[in-house]
Amino acid sequence: MASLRLFSTNHQSLLLPSSLSQKTLISSPRFVNNPSRRSPIRSVLQFNRKPELAGETPRIVVITSGKGGVGKTTTTANVGLSLARYGFSVVAIDADLGLRNLDLLLGLENRVNYTCVEVINGDCRLDQALVRDKRWSNFELLCISKPRSKLPMGFGGKALEWLVDALKTRPEGSPDFIIIDCPAGIDAGFITAITPANEAVLVTTPDITALRDADRVTGLLECDGIRDIKMIVNRVRTDMIKGEDMMSVLDVQEMLGLSLLGVIPEDSEVIRSTNRGFPLVLNKPPTLAGLAFEQAAWRLVEQDSMKAVMVEEEPKKRGFFSFFGG
């Protein structure tokens, strides 16, 4: 029987074994001292080395989608916090004009007193607009505007570039990562958000409307000079793929032609974590979606990717990270 398997492009895979369940542990010898032991599922943060940062710093990454509601802001929160937990300094910029939500997902909404607008107008210093997460002091949030507010005339990509340059030259040092949460759509807000970026993470779901928008956004990113584009496929359900009611990850990859950074399973815990302002990657015990976000962050650090391939094998029980079709 043919099935779809996902592998890291690095020969030392980050993927979970095919026998994964909530009672088995991640058994890659790269990270686990004794892979034969059984224990509750563990976070990748318990592995025995820190990912090696590739590329020049700061890495300026825009997380975008085109279509709204595919999990772009959820991805920003979880990948950003995972990077901070790996030990890298991170500034996340919510570039959604008047409709910011990243502060809610991070549980920081009551601590945002100033935004980029006040910094640009000279009403506050940049360090006053940055909100430092109390859980991880190397993670900071910067909001572009207040909810339902309008940006001043002339605010655009150049202004955001100025803010990014200010982050690079601040007295306490440049962050390792600047993560920009891009608004949905392809209007002026999108153009503003992608202007300072030199790499992009495209979030999509395995449905035809999201993929058409993602394909359009890919073209716009390339026209803007962003060639390093990786993809996260979100809200994947293996039961629907096996029933041929949802496109497989391989189908998505073939349609968009992008490097695969991560595959995130459908997870009801996302709604609970959003309402609590407590990202999935902080859950104990971790969920499969939380682990998938952590692994995507690891690949982002090392500029690694996943590869979907068809293999022939005998029918057997399969886990989420090793089976995406039938």
Swiss-Prot record:
An annotated GO BP: chloroplast fission
CDD domains per UniProt: MinD
GO terms of molecular function: ATP binding; ATP hydrolysis activity; calcium-dependent ATPase activity; identical protein binding; protein homodimerization activity
Location of the transit peptide in the chain: 1-62
Induction: Accumulates during seed germination, at the beginning of rapid greening.
Listed InterPro entries: CobQ/CobB/MinD/ParA_Nub-bd_dom, MinD, P-loop_NTPase, ParA/MinD_ATPase
Compartment annotation: Plastid, Chloroplast inner membrane
GO cellular component, one term: chloroplast inner membrane
UniProt xrefs under Gene3D superfamilies: P-loop containing nucleotide triphosphate hydrolases (3.40.50.300)
Modes of activity regulation: Stimulated ATPase activity by MINE1.
Keywords assigned by UniProt, alphabetized: ATP-binding, Chloroplast, Membrane, Nucleotide-binding, Plastid, Plastid inner membrane, Transit peptide
Membrane topology reported for the UniProt record: Peripheral membrane protein
Major localisation: plastid
Described purpose of this protein according to its UniProt entry: Together with ARC3 and MCD1, regulates FtsZ ring positioning in chloroplasts in an ARC6-dependent manner. Calcium-dependent ATPase required for the correct placement of the plastid division site. Inhibits FtsZ filament and ring formation in the plastid. Mediates inhibition of plastid division. In cooperation with MINE1, prevents FtsZ ring formation anywhere outside of the mid-plastids.
Name under which the protein is recorded: Septum site-determining protein minD homolog, chloroplastic
